[in-house]
Amino acid sequence: MRANKIVYTSNTGFTRRYAEMLGKAAGLPVYDLAQSPQGGSALYLGWLRAGKIHGLARARKKHLVTGCCAVGLTDRPPMEKLSAQLPEGKVFYLRGGYDHGGQHGLNRLMMTAMIKSMERRPPEDAAAQGLLRAAREGADFVTEEQLSPVEDWLRG
């Protein structure tokens, strides 16, 4: 195993669901970052905000992060940008979802502004149209199938 635990930070539950699925499949304990015991190697799962993997810096201070799953809404992840955030480990992307009602404070303000900005210009293709619809109405793209490469890497 390339990690002895799974640690996550979740905002609206999509990342937590992936962490729990991975823990069950790999037989590893799963912890919310805030409650995780310090030390040991970890696969970290964090949600994306403005291209940054939320909580990764804190996870790296507390654990040896050997791999990371960035969970986001788009079907076109910026893998170079994501991989640069953990150059010494493996970075995966999992398409999660969006729940506007679950957003609060700054996150809600940022997403509301992003939706308004997207609405001002016509979507350039079907993917952009789908992203706008998901942001407006909410969406859930969590699937076990997306975890296959992560499970293979964990078994290493």
Annotate each PLM feature.
Residues 13-16, 100, 144:
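Loop/helix-junction capping segments adjacent to catalytic residues or to phosphate/diphosphate-binding pockets
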Residues 1-61, 152-156:
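N-terminal beta1-alpha1-beta2 submodule of the flavodoxin-like/Rossmannoid cofactor-binding fold
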Residues 34-107:
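Helix-loop-strand module that forms the ligand-binding subsite of alpha/beta enzymes
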Residues 113-156:
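Glycine-rich phosphate/pyrophosphate-binding loop and the adjoining helix
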